[in-house]
Amino acid sequence: MRTEPRPPAPSPPSAAAGARAAHPHHAQVHPAVALQPARGVGGQAALFAAGRAGGDLPLQPQPGGAAARRQPAARAAQAFFPAAELAQAGPERQRDPAVASRGGQLHAAGGAGRVPERYP
């Protein structure tokens, strides 16, 4: 009867290996924690939803923001189309060369006293 030599028994873990395993940076993370998205769109959306539910984030624009500094559309249109402004003014204002020469568009359309129907 022949006996084969047994493989050597595994050596006990060394003190250094035990110290490495005990270090918090080397500790294994639980799989449920490791699978959660730490960053990205999904994580941010969940964060914002949680903030809105708690009332941390505003749902409406706040006064004094960018919308409050913006010019109304009617005023912005007058800066580009002075004829609309002149059409609302009286005839004495329409004949004023200082007003009619703004941008040179009214002079090209026929002079200081004439307001064009529309721009080309």
Curated annotation (Swiss-Prot):
Q: Which UniProt keywords apply?
A: Translation regulation
* Gene Ontology BP annotations: negative regulation of translational initiation
Misc remark for this entry? This protein is produced by a polycistronic gene which also produces the tumor suppressor gene SCRIB from an overlapping reading frame.
Bias kind Pro residues: ranges: 1-13
Q: What is this protein called?
A: SCRIB overlapping open reading frame protein
Question: Which stretches of sequence are listed as region Disordered?
Answer: 1-30, 86-120
UniProt function note: Represses translation of the downstream SCRIB protein. Translation of oSCRIB hinders SCRIB translation but does not completely abolish it, probably due to leaky scanning which allows the ribosome to bypass the weaker oSCRIB start codon and initiate translation at the stronger SCRIB start codon.
